Structures are given as structure tokens and as C-alpha cells.
């Protein structure tokens, strides 16, 4: 019930969810309500390995995999040790930490909870002190690419 649906398509999950409404909710001041590939990849792995996969589980799983495939940024990585910069590196897979609930635009937020859309708009201590992007879905999409799209649903 907490998987976020955008324009009729199943995507990924939020970082935190309300236990009653299942809506994405904020955490710390810079952790806005969102969709996040970091926390979602473990859910997808669990669903891919679920023994008695119902049609609902199958749709949830492949909807999320499709989201990862559509939103990967190839040949870039997040260098936290270089003050939190996004840098070119051939062969890398990258997803940003937070995505809007209604579209696939990524964002960041400072401690004042205001969304910003470039990493350079972050406070330097927050920019280098938090994992704003990562390769979280790399193994997932590499493994799932072995299954043709017409066999997924």
C-alpha cells in the first residue's frame, strides 16, 4: 500500500511512511517527503525473491524495476570525499537520493527544509555529510536485464 504510483505507474517507495495512511512523510529537516531509490532497492530485492508471488507483487516488483531503469544516470558517481560532488566516471550507475512524489525530478534539501535542484545549492557541511546519490540500483537492473520485458508481467 505504500508503493508510490505516478501517472498510473508503480514506482518506488518513500524514505518514511505514515503507518496509517502509508503516505510518504518527512524525517529530519532535510529529509522531505519523497521517493528514494536507496531504501526502495531492498524492498524490490525482497519482492523479487518472494516465494508465492501474486499478481500484485509481480506488478509492484516490475514497476519498481522499470523506474530504476528509466532513472539511472550512467557514467556518473557521487564523490562524498570530494565535498559531495557528482563526477564523471565511465561505467558507473547513479541515482539521486530523493525524487518528487509526482514526477521523476530529483531534488536536495537544506536544513531549512526548502527543496533545491542542484547539489551546489546545499550547505557545504550537508553536501559532504550525507549520501545524496549512489549506485543503489546497479545490481538490481543488471540482474533484471537478464529477463526480457515481455516476461516480466
Label every PLM stretch briefly.
Residues 1-34:
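Active-site cradle of extracellular carbohydrate-active enzymes
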Residues 23-27, 31, 35-153:
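Terminal, non-catalytic domain-edge segments
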